[in-house]
Amino acid sequence: MVQRLVYRSRHSYATKSNQHRIVKTPGGKLVYQTTKKRASGPKCPVTGKRIQGIPHLRPSEYKRSRLSRNRRTVNRAYGGVLSGSAVRERIIRAFLVEEQKIVKKVLKLQKAKEKVAPKA
């Protein structure tokens, strides 16, 4: 006769967080083993792309004790948070804003010189 299986924990509903698989133990018994959810990995909040170079783990497994720092991040500004293209875009935007400020300042000085020159 077939061995009956009983859930060992949680509730009996077939939800995503309560998935099981049947495993045969060394003693020959069949038991339910809880399966973990598949990890999708960290995403960039700006572009929505997956961040390269970081393993796909469940959120609790990124903790200090389970994963060393060099495996949690990428070695660049905003490493492990933003994707490379988002960081590049941000750097270029910041540079252009600073350039615009300088241009404004120069134009203001030129205008001031023009106002002073005709009077003399």
Curated annotation (Swiss-Prot):
MF (Gene Ontology): mRNA binding; structural constituent of ribosome
Disordered: annotated segments: 31-51
Gene3D superfamilies: 6.20.340.10, 6.20.370.70
InterPro entries the record matches: Ribosomal_eL34 (IPR008195), Ribosomal_eL34_C_sf (IPR038562), Ribosomal_eL34_CS (IPR018065)
Keyword annotations: Ribonucleoprotein, Ribosomal protein
Domain of life, per lineage: Eukaryota
GO terms (BP aspect): translation
Entry's Gene Ontology cellular component terms: nucleolus; nucleus; ribonucleoprotein complex; ribosome
Family affiliation: Belongs to the eukaryotic ribosomal protein eL34 family.
Name under which the protein is recorded: Large ribosomal subunit protein eL34z
Biological source species: Arabidopsis thaliana (Mouse-ear cress)
Lineage: Eukaryota, Viridiplantae, Streptophyta, Embryophyta, Tracheophyta
